[in-house]
Each structure stands twice: as structure tokens, then as C-alpha cells.
């Protein structure tokens, strides 16, 4: 598995491009819904870039760890505000399997949203749902700025289960662009947390 570790600045630039695509398409969402948890940060930025919309959330649980997903996502929190009759932009950070996007989209449609369009920063070619708007197609495992420590925690767990040295995982993350000092810091913090 190849990791890609985009910076905050790269993500912001990608969101600027996405906002331009949405504006050029003449789609004006009245509500932007971020899928918990990865969709929250980009949904908030998109609210700022597009303006004139309300921000809401929906919670879908899918991944247990890195590349370790349940078969089907579960809606754990319905949309937080009424969407009936509204144009809705549903946002997530990545369309990987596409199942969580599909589940959330179906949920919003069942709540009688007028139009539901989907947007993600990254799109993977095997996703069962191609977002209406996305910025980059990739096959890599994306490590977003808002989930780096969580990713390292999962990597440590996976390395232990598979008998792989943690050093190997560290090198793969560094090769993907994560700062080595940050990797070491998080590993040390996690190991201290485990010791109590």
C-alpha cells in the first residue's frame, strides 16, 4: 500500500478548485452536509468558500482501521437539520468504496432533499459511486492532516498483528510525505498512552 500525505495547504488548494467547479456548474447548495468524521473539515472549508449555506452533519461508520473496513457502512447519526426541499452538497474527504457516500446520499434523499450532489477531495477508481465533484483520482491510501495520529495508531496496531517492525511502517509514511519528526512524536505519544 502506498501512502499519500497531503499538506494542509495542498488540501486547501484542492478545495479552492472544487469550489470553482461547483460554482461553474451553477450549483448553489442551501445546505452542506459533512460525513462524519473525515468530511467535517472539508465541509467547513467549503461552507466558507461557497458561502450562503448552512452546515450540517451525518455520521456513517465504516473503517475499523487502515484498509480494514466493515462490509457495509452504518448510519449512526441522521442528518442534523431538516433538508426537505433543499439543494444539498454532501461532502466527504475521499470516495473509497463509495458505500458510505451512497448510504448518506440515500438517507438525504429519503429526507426529501430537492437535489443531492456529492463532492470529495479524492476519488478512487473502484468506488461504486463517482462523486459529482472531486479533485483528484488516486489509488493511494490518503492520510489527511486531520487524522495523522489516528493513522499512526492503526499502523502500530496492524504492525503488531502482522509481526512487522514499526520502523517499516514509519518509512512508508515518510516516503508518502509525512514529516519524520511528527511520526516519531506520535509514536512516542501513543506508546506512552499505552503504558498508562
How would you name each of these model-derived features?
Residues 1-196:
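PRPP-associated nucleotide enzymes
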Amino acid at each position: 500500500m502506498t501512502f499519500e500525505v497531503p499538506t494542509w495547504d495542498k488540501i486547501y488548494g484542492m478545495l479552492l478548485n472544487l469550489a470553482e467547479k461547483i460554482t461553474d456548474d451553477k450549483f448553489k447548495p442551501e445546505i452542506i452536509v459533512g460525513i462524519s468524521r473525515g468530511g467535517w473539515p472539508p465541509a467547513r472549508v467549503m461552507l466558507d468558500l461557497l458561502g450562503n449555506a448552512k452546515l450540517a452533519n451525518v455520521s456513517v461508520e465504516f473503517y475499523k482501521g487502515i484498509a480494514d473496513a466493515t462490509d457495509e457502512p452504518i448510519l449512526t447519526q441522521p442528518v442534523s437539520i431538516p433538508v426537505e426541499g433543499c439543494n444539498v452538497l454532501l461532502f466527504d474527504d475521499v470516495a473509497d468504496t463509495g458505500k458510505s457516500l451512497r448510504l448518506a446520499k440515500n438517507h438525504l434523499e429519503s429526507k426529501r432533499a430537492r437535489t443531492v450532489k456529492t463532492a470529495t477531495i479524492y476519488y478512487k477508481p473502484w468506488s461504486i459511486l463517482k462523486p459529482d465533484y472531486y479533485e483528484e483520482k488516486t489509488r493511494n491510501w490518503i492520510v489527511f492532516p486531520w487524522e495523522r495520529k489516528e493513522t499512526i495508531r492503526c499502523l502500530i496496531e496492524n504492525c503488531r498483528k502482522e509481526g512487522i517492525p514499526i520502523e517499516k511502517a514509519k518509512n512508508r509514511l515518510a516516503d508518502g510525505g509525512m514529516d519524520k519528526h511528527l511520526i516519531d512524536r506520535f509514536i512516542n505519544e501513543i506508546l506512552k498512552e499505552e503504558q498508562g
